[in-house]
Curated annotation (Swiss-Prot):
GO terms for biological process: ribosomal large subunit assembly; translation. The keyword RNA-binding applies. Gene3D superfamilies: 6.10.160.10, Ribosomal protein L20 (1.10.1900.20), SAP domain (1.10.720.30). It holds the Pfam family Ribosomal_L20. This is Large ribosomal subunit protein bL20. It comes from Oenococcus oeni (strain ATCC BAA-331 / PSU-1). GO terms for cellular component: ribonucleoprotein complex; ribosome. The keyword rRNA-binding applies. PROSITE patterns: RIBOSOMAL_L20 (PS00937). CDD domains: Ribosomal_L20 (cd07026).
Length: 196
């Protein structure tokens, strides 16, 4: 006697048809066609989970660029000015500010414009009434940047001696705080030897 997989087969096929709900034509009725379309849909979903990140980044950059040009500065100069000023806002937040709170965005753009036009870019200062809080790498507490003060003077010094577990940047920060000269191309082992 031939055994037919009635219940199991029906359940399996109904599950696939349920996944194909809303498709046009035979793609939501016929099991064979529905199965192919569901598999193709999974491929589209996988691909577009990657693409949506790119698309949103493009959208944020377009919004920031439009708002920054209203303030007389290009997108690239704005981002460079933020980097020099030590303003760590991501593109998502900047785009949200550009759309919902243009006055604050304008103040930030003015700060960036001053940083770009300043002849010495190293000693950058914030002279707006916006307080920005960020956490320095290796710092014990957040560094608060206040108007009119240099970002260099507010950095927290690394107190403890670096160990082999410390990063090269932390070791260099320690050597800088102790005023120890070191070659810029020095390896981690050479820097640790200078610490001792």
């Amino acid at each position: 006697m031939r055994v037919k997989g009635t219940n199991v087969t029906r359940i399996r096929r109904k599950k696939m048809i349920k996944l194909a709900k809303g498709y046009r034509g035979q793609r939501h009725i016929n099991f064979k066609v529905a199965k192919q379309q569901v598999w193709k849909s999974y491929l589209y979903a996988y691909r577009d989970r990657k693409n949506v990140k790119r698309d949103y980044r493009k959208l944020w950059i377009a919004r920031i660029n439009a708002a920054s040009r209203k303030n007389g500065i290009s997108y690239s100069q704005l981002m460079h000015g933020f980097k020099v000023a030590g303003i760590d806002l991501n593109r998502k937040m900047l785009a949200e500010l550009a759309v919902s709170d243009f006055a604050t965005f304008s103040k930030l753009a003015e700060t960036a414009k001053k940083q770009v036009s300043a002849p010495t870019r190293k000693a950058a200062t914030l002279d707006t009434d916006i307080k920005i809080e960020r956490i320095e790498k290796g710092a014990a507490k957040p560094v608060v940047l206040e108007p009119g003060k240099s970002t260099k003077t507010q950095e927290v010094a690394v107190a403890e001696k670096p160990t082999t577990a410390s990063t090269v940047a932390e070791i260099k920060a320690y050597l800088d705080s102790e005023s120890i000269k070191y070659p810029s191309s020095a390896k981690k082992a050479d820097l640790l030897a200078l610490v001792k």
